[in-house]
């Protein structure tokens, strides 16, 4: 039995996520698709726009077989810790492959980056100019898009495993706020808060009132 794993937030679930599920199944030829999904809190430290149970239900309705929760301690961390927590769960689930989206969609290049460590000389040079360690580390990664950074983090976490990585081309930019059929989750969230109709980008029935209600629980 072939098992494929994906790592998700679904904040909210949209057409791009549906494409990811379809491609993961097609490219891996898996019998079972497992999604590791953030719970009620997501990587940027905010509460998810929709509760985890509704998001998991929608994932199963759209092609995922099993949804496993990524614990809060990993879900709200940096890319490397987020990825390590998710990959550890998928390793325990005995997956054969993982499938993720990336902007470059070049596994060879991403793997080469994953095989290297931080350039300490550049890091020290950036810190000597007055940057803090987190800012200096961020500047070293500034030329990489968000999903490429996550992809490298997944590949680092997969080191010394037999799990095969599959990359698919991300069809939009995370920071793109244009609402189209394949729109970023960020664009959809902004549109909801602006009282816009988001049905072109997501089949998830999300109301402005739901999102405003959840905002009161943001940390």
Task: Go through the PLM ranges and name each one.
Residues 1-55:
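N-terminal catalytic cores of NTP/NDP-binding nucleotidyl/phosphoryl-transfer enzymes
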Residues 6-7, 36-37, 68-70, 166-169:
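Short beta-strands and strand-loop turn motifs
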Residues 8, 42-43, 59, 73-74, ...:
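Short, contiguous strand/loop micro-motifs
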Residues 25-26, 60, 87-91:
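Non-catalytic positions within long, well-ordered alpha-helices that form the structural scaffold/packing
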Residues 28-31, 64, 95:
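Short, high-confidence coil segments that cap the C-terminus of an alpha-helix
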Residues 57-71:
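A glycine-rich helix N-cap at a beta->alpha junction
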Residues 70-219:
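Active-site cores that bind ATP or allylic diphosphates and position pyrophosphate for catalysis
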């Amino acid at each position: 039995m072939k098992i494929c794993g994906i790592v998700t937030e679904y904040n909210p679930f949209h057409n791009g996520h549906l494409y990811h599920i379809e491609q993961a199944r097609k490219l891996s030829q898996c019998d079972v698709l497992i999604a590791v999904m953030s719970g009620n809190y997501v990587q940027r430290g905010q509460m998810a726009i929709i509760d985890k149970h509704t998001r998991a239900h929608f994932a199963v309705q759209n092609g995922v077989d099993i949804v496993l929760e990524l614990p809060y301690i990993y879900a709200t961390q940096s890319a490397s810790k987020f990825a390590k927590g998710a990959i550890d769960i998928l390793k325990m689930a005995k997956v054969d492959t993982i499938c993720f989206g990336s902007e470059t969609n070049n596994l060879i290049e991403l793997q080469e980056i994953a095989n290297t460590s931080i350039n300490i000389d550049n890091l020290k040079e950036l810190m000597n100019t007055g940057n803090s360690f987190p800012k200096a580390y961020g500047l070293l990664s500034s030329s990489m898009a968000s999903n490429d950074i996550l992809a490298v983090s997944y590949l680092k976490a997969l080191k010394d495993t037999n799990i095969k990585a599959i990359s698919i081309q991300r069809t939009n930019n995370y920071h793109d706020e244009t609402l189209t059929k394949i729109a970023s989750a960020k664009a959809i969230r902004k549109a909801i808060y602006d009282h816009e109709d988001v049905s072109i980008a997501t089949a998830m029935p999300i109301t402005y009132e739901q999102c405003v209600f959840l905002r009161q629980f943001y940390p």
